Amino acid sequence: MRSGVIAQKVGMTRVFTETGEHIPVTVLKLGNCQVLAHRTTEKNGYVALQLGSGARKTVYMPKAERGQFAVAKVEPKRKVAEFRVSEDALIPVGAEIQADHFVVGQFVDVTGTSVGKGFAGGMKRWNFGGLRATHGVSVSHRSIGSTGGRQDPGKTFKNKKMPGHMGVDRITTLNLRVVQLDVERGLILVEGAVPGSKGGWISVRDAVKKALPADAPKPGKFRLANGGEEAAAPAAEQEGV
C-alpha cells in the first residue's frame, strides 16, 4: 500500500481529447509535499508516513511543533497529515513526492472539506419535498412537518433529519481518473469534481476499490532531500525481481 499526497485545489477546467471531446477536470497542486516522519510498528503500533505541504511562518508556531520540523530538517509546513502504508512503501524523511507519483489513467480517492453553506432548511439540506402549496397550508410551505410520534415514543430520535448547519464536512470522492500530469509545475488533473473550495487542502490516495496500475512507481516517485531524484521501479518490475 503506497502513500498518498497532500495537494491544494486550484479550481476546475476542461481538457480536450484527440477526438475533440472535452473532459471536466479539477486541478490539484502539490506544494512541496515532503515526508516529515515515519510511524513504525515497534514505536507506534502501526506503519505510516507523516507528510507536510505548503509554507508556514514560525512566528506563532509552538516550540514543540518547530522542533518536529527541525528534526526532519524541512521547512515548516502549513498542512500535516498521515498516510497508512505498508512496510515496503516507506519513503525517506525529507524526500519530496512528485506529481508523477501517480500515472495517467489510474483511479484515485480524494478527501476534502466540503464548502460551508451555513444554516439550511430541510428542503435544501435533506431534499425534503415540503408541504402542499394550498389546501390549508399557510406560511409553512417549506417546513419539515412532524419530527416524531405522539405520547409514544414522546421524543424526537437522534439523527433525525432537521434544519441545521450544512457543509464543512469531511467528504471522500471515490474513483476519480487521473487525466493529465504536469510534473514541472506539480499539477494533477483528475476527472470530475473534488470536494472543497479553491485553495482547500485535499488528500489524494490510490483508489481502494480499483487495482493499482502495473506501471505505478513503488514505493513512489520522489526527489531526495539532497537534490537527487529517486526513480522508483514500477510495481510489476519489483515483483519480478
UniProtKB/Swiss-Prot annotation:
Residues 139-164, 215-241 are annotated as: Disordered. PROSITE patterns: RIBOSOMAL_L3 (PS00474). Residues 225-241 have a biased composition (Low complexity). One of its GO terms (molecular function) is structural constituent of ribosome. Keywords: Methylation, Ribonucleoprotein, Ribosomal protein, RNA-binding, rRNA-binding. It comes from the Bacteria. The keyword Nucleotide-binding does not apply. The modification N5-methylglutamine is found at residue 151. GO terms for cellular component: cytosolic large ribosomal subunit. Disulfide bonds: none annotated. Methylated by PrmB. SUPFAM superfamilies: Translation proteins (SSF50447). Gene3D superfamilies: 3.30.160.810, Translation factors (2.40.30.10). GO terms for biological process: translation. One of the primary rRNA binding proteins, it binds directly near the 3'-end of the 23S rRNA, where it nucleates assembly of the 50S subunit. Part of the 50S ribosomal subunit. Forms a cluster with proteins L14 and L19. Belongs to the universal ribosomal protein uL3 family. PANTHER family: 50S RIBOSOMAL PROTEIN L3, LARGE RIBOSOMAL SUBUNIT PROTEIN UL3C. This is Large ribosomal subunit protein uL3. It comes from Rhodopseudomonas palustris (strain HaA2). The lineage of its organism: Bacteria, Pseudomonadati, Pseudomonadota, Alphaproteobacteria, Hyphomicrobiales. The gene is rplC.
